Design a protein with these regions (language model features):
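Predominantly flavin-linked oxidoreductase catalytic cores and closely associated redox partners
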Residues: 1-152
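A glycine-rich dinucleotide-binding beta-alpha-beta segment and adjacent secondary-structure elements
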Residues: 153-171
Length: 171
């Protein structure tokens, strides 16, 4: 459920969020079928909006949370879900890599998670600070899957889902 507003206590402390507000017009006014959101208050409030989080930006500005911090860093993350042959599956196995096939001038890494039902999640994240205009993160992901250890896991399997998104890397 998306959150549309941050709630502050009288003393200025972060108190909660408004969630589940639906039916606003493009200009922000209530439209036909408008449903107000529900206030959710908590002792702790976690904002997990991703790289374009408008509520997080508001909170960062209000409390000056970016003072003395590095500039934000971003990456592009790609993930595929595979159904693999049982003999290629090891439920619970986790593999993280870094570097290859990107080379020394670029940074990124991969993950391979063996979940239940012969499902394997394969993902690759490339930092968006690369200088080579010809670097194509999607093709680097394809190269990664041809590594002998990864290809062996995926051999005879079937990709059943995929996606990509921008990810925060620090800052």
């Amino acid at each position: 459920m998306a959150c549309s507003e941050v709630i502050y206590a009288d003393d200025g402390a972060l108190k909660g969020v408004v969630a589940g507000e639906f039916g606003k017009n493009a200009d922000g006014t209530p439209g036909d079928g408008y449903e107000p959101g529900m206030e959710l208050h908590g002792k702790y409030v976690f904002l997990s909006e991703g790289v374009r989080g408008s509520l997080a930006k508001e909170v960062i500005a209000k409390y000056n949370l970016s003072a003395n911090c590095d500039v934000p860093k971003f990456g592009i993350g790609m993930k595929e879900i595979w159904e693999v042959k049982p003999e290629n599956h090891n439920q619970g196995e986790v593999t993280h890599t870094m570097g290859w096939p990107l080379g020394f001038k670029n940074s990124g890494g991969s993950f391979i998670y063996h979940l239940e039902n012969n499902r394997v999640y394969v993902g690759y994240i490339v930092d968006l600070k690369y200088k080579n205009p010809y670097l194509f993160p999607y093709m680097e992901f394809q190269r990664l899957k041809h590594h002998q250890k990864i290809a062996k896991v995926l051999e005879g399997g079937k990709r059943i889902a995929y996606g990509a998104r921008a990810v925060t890397k620090g800052g």
